[in-house]
Regions:
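Conserved N-terminal beta-strand and adjoining loop/helix that marks the start
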Residues: 5-30, 52
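Short connector loops at helix/strand junctions that flank enzyme active sites
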Residues: 16, 44, 101-105
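Conserved Nudix-box catalytic region and its N-terminal flanking loop in Nudix hydrolases
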Residues: 25-73
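A short coil-to-beta-strand element that immediately follows conserved catalytic motifs
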Residues: 71-83
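Active-site-adjacent beta-strand/loop module that shapes the phosphate/pyrophosphate-binding cleft
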Residues: 81-117, 129
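NUDIX/MutT-family hydrolases
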Residues: 106-150
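Charged phosphate-binding loop/patch that engages nucleotide di/tri-phosphates or the phosphate backbone
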Residues: 137-171
């Protein structure tokens, strides 16, 4: 009688460092996607580093492509140079090594010229919507994601002021 040998790959834990990418248009329409494992949980693109030495911009571009089908290299990906540290929800801690309860998240923005077609990864997300930034901030399940969307409006206004001042047009 032949025995059946099964091989289980060892559990690969998530690295507790991630990115959040607010995808938006110049007129501040924001793309939100709904998680497949949590109906009603709307969010921006998020994801963890695949390796400790993976550059953050590479992680951001990879996650955008995986979750939406959008190729970040075709548009303007900006590192917001903003980092937060938050407690990992208890229901998701099993994805991390024992004792890991906090995650460091780096914020990025991806500006597309208009709402672009989205191809969702059905195992991760079930629906998407382009919303005005205020409505998007209200829809976000996570308070930190909502804050990132609210910062988008501030960053856009600050960027316009910087460009005006640099051009010598300020009065």
């Amino acid at each position: 009688m032949l025995g059946v040998c099964s091989y289980r790959r060892p559990m690969r834990y998530k690295i507790p460092e991630s990115v959040l990418v607010v995808i938006h248009t110049p007129d501040l329409q924001v793309l939100l996607i709904e998680r497949a494992d949590r109906p009603g949980f709307w969010q921006s693109v998020t994801g963890s580093l695949d390796a400790d030495d993976e550059p953050l911009a590479v992680t951001a571009a990879r996650e955008v492509a995986e979750e939406t089908g959008i190729l970040a290299a075709s548009f303007e990906l900006t590192d917001w140079q903003h980092t937060i540290d938050y407690e990992i929800y208890p229901q998701w801690r099993h994805r991390y090594a024992a004792g890991i309860t906090r995650n460091t998240e780096h914020w990025f923005g991806l500006c597309v010229p208009e709402p672009v077609p989205v191809t969702l990864a059905p195992r991760e997300h079930t629906r998407f919507e382009w919303l005005p930034w205020q409505a998007a901030a209200e829809r976000c399940f996570s308070s930190s994601n909502a804050e990132a969307v609210r910062q988008l409006a501030w960053r856009t206004q600050a960027g316009q002021l910087d460009r005006t001042l640099a051009g010598g047009v300020a009065r």
